[in-house]
Amino acid sequence: MSYHPGHGHRQEPRKGAGARRGFARPDDSADAPRTGPLIFEERSTENAGAAPPIEEQLKVHNNPYASLNIQQQRIRLPIFKNRGHILYMCERYRTIIIVGETGCGKSTQVPQFLLEAGWAADGRQIVITQPRRVAVVTLATRVAEEKDCILGHDVGYTVRFDDVSDKDTKVKFMTDGLLLREILADPLLSKYSIIMIDEAHERSCNTDILLGLLRKIIQIRNDLRIIVSSATLDAELFKDFFEMNETGNSDKDTAGIISVEGRTHPVAVHHTKTSVPDYCQSAVDTVINIHKHENPGDILVFLTGQDEVEDVCEKLRELAGNLKNCDRLWVVPCYGALPAREQMKAFDSTPHGTRKVVVATNIAEASITIPGICYVIDTGYVKLRAQHAANGVETLMRVTVSKASAEQRAGRAGRIRPGKCYRLYPESEFERFAEGTVPEIQRCQMASTILQLKALGVQNVHRFHYLSPPPSWAMINGLELLYALGAIDETSQLTSPLGLQMAEFPLPPMHSKCLLKSAEFGCSTEMVTIVAMMQIQDVFITPYRQRHQADVIRKKFAVEEGDHMTMLNVFTKFVENGRSKKWCSDHFVNYRGLMRADNVRSQLVRLLKRFEIEKVSSRGLINCSENIRQCLVTGFFSQAAQYHYTGKYMTVKESFPFNMYKGSSIMFKKDYPKWVIFTEVMQDSIRDVTVIEPEWLYELAPHYYEFGTEGELAEKRMRGPAATSAAADDDY
């Protein structure tokens, strides 16, 4: 891969391996849990100073702000004393960069400062963007509570497939991707007086593109103010990007920086002496040891994804039921795919005599602040998407976090009192981590971004003003894919109607192509269900003590044509059984995920109606499965693979080897199919796989592949350059 997130590599730990781990007490005041053999060594974070004596830490057991009413809590936030300065800077500068640690109050208070100062007068709105939907929902809910108003009126939010706002909304939270889409209809974002780009340091692809567009907009709209909010010290990068003053006279600067002190306490950081063989099990053991031996205070555990979070939560709940002479252990999951009501549980006050354990992905690293956290367990891993330079395939990879992310995680333990962070990796490994995470725009598939830019009127995407330019090979791969999909023509202009319609879907281009072509294959009803199901992470759940039962049930849903037909089967049965939560539980199906897919499906149906795509079903037809699978090929022909005698699948383009994902329904087949397409890649495995016939590639993508034997292809190349954008060297 072209993307290397760390300096050096950690040995990949096994999940589900290794014995239970205990802790040995170090010879220092800020001790780790007390049973061994897993040994922790203490290191204090550089910005925290030395931890105070343990007797001082014992004086505070609960959140000192919990007894205050909401307005008193607002006043106590660190950012409140900067209120006047922030409002002055909004008058003085066109762009304001606010640097403040997570938890200082910038995300919830700055919008209220602006509202109170009249920036939402005359029908204008204040909009705040976030990279993640969970942050959008939680922040909007909190601000509405602080303003004592109904969520959706004065304060509202908009995320993909869910709009909780009305025409009178004054403060609106939304994902950065949705604000990008608004520019399609309103290029100058004229209804907004102030646009606040929050969590800009996360450098999502949408955020980077949005910053580039806003830089153009403020040159036209003198009345618009841009606020860029960041939790890390990269303020100069943003200031230089937005600064329009070229005279050298600072009095004419158009961008200014304000730093906000955080409300942090010292955090004692403990590293393991050696690498752990199974970080999920080690995280479970560490939680139990903290709960048995440490003072009151909630725990935050960082894992990489929904499957790990649910697995660890289940183990903790089982162990918690057997604990004696301990306070109650309340286990709460937190990840992006959770419904809003479930996500909000992480923010609920912890009852007396209870310790809350929040098991989260990296959404809890910076986007949201969970109250009451005193202990952090950092596994040192995160899942990121990265594109392979040669074959253009985007992979969801588990990689080590950066040093900046590790410090962010540790800092979550020091919000209300001196805290502790337990890192499940040695300090020597930490020193090999990269300083920061590579911006998403420099490691991901660019087709969606290019499609959006084209729709926004940016014709020369290479010369767009990027905060960090993407690599040229990524731009070329993205343009080639869009051309192959029929979204752009030979001059790189959007095609009509296909390219224009694809740009309006809040989906990756390959997904939207399948939807827009589905009526031609007589399966639009089925395809809208499959595409909706592709937007959720996991269709099935596998409790760690019921794996055999889950596999037996799962096998009943599996069909030999592959995962997408299996998804269709599951959703159909879900609807036939009244969308029952009990039915899902009995069949090890992800109820939360299917409810989300149901909502997404409704939104996609409305879009198809707007584009006058005929509603037609293949159900009951002899060639039903074939129609659906051929329709999938129209979008995912570039991700075709052939079975190799080594047991791997080789991509047709560039002959790149992949394993079959162990959770695929293909694994239930006696023999592996010879040809497949895949719509997702995790690490080195293809998942969400559908069986195809090789002739379909010839029929549906003759413009993308060359066909013939090795000798025929060699002779064709000797005669002249290939007229296609990609060539396959495999025999066909």
Swiss-Prot record:
Q: Where is this region: Disordered?
A: 1-50
| Annotated family | Belongs to the DEAD box helicase family. DEAH subfamily.
Q: Mind telling me what this protein is named?
A: Probable ATP-dependent RNA helicase DHX35 homolog
**Enzyme class, first EC level, given as a word:** hydrolase
InterPro entries tied to this protein: DEAD-box_helicase_OB_fold, DEAD/DEAH_box_helicase_dom, DNA/RNA_helicase_DEAH_CS, HA2_WH, Helicase-assoc_dom, Helicase_ATP-bd, Helicase_C-like, P-loop_NTPase
Q: Where does ATP bind?
A: 100-107
Reaction catalysed?
ATP + H2O = ADP + phosphate + H(+)
- Upper lineage ranks? Eukaryota, Metazoa, Ecdysozoa, Nematoda, Chromadorea
Q: What is its EC number?
A: 3.6.4.13
Q: Which residues form the Helicase ATP-binding domain?
A: 87-251
Domain Helicase C-terminal positions: 283-457
Q: Which PROSITE patterns match?
A: DEAH_ATP_HELICASE, HELICASE_ATP_BIND_1, HELICASE_CTER
Where on this chain is DEAH box (motif)?
A: 198-201
Query: Which Pfam family is an annotated match for this chain, by its short name?
Result: HA2_C
Question: What keywords is this UniProt entry annotated with?
Answer: ATP-binding, Helicase, Hydrolase, Nucleotide-binding
Q: Which domain of life is it from?
A: Eukaryota
> An example Gene Ontology cellular component term from the record?
catalytic step 2 spliceosome
For molecular function, the Gene Ontology terms on record are: ATP binding; ATP hydrolysis activity; helicase activity; RNA binding; RNA helicase activity
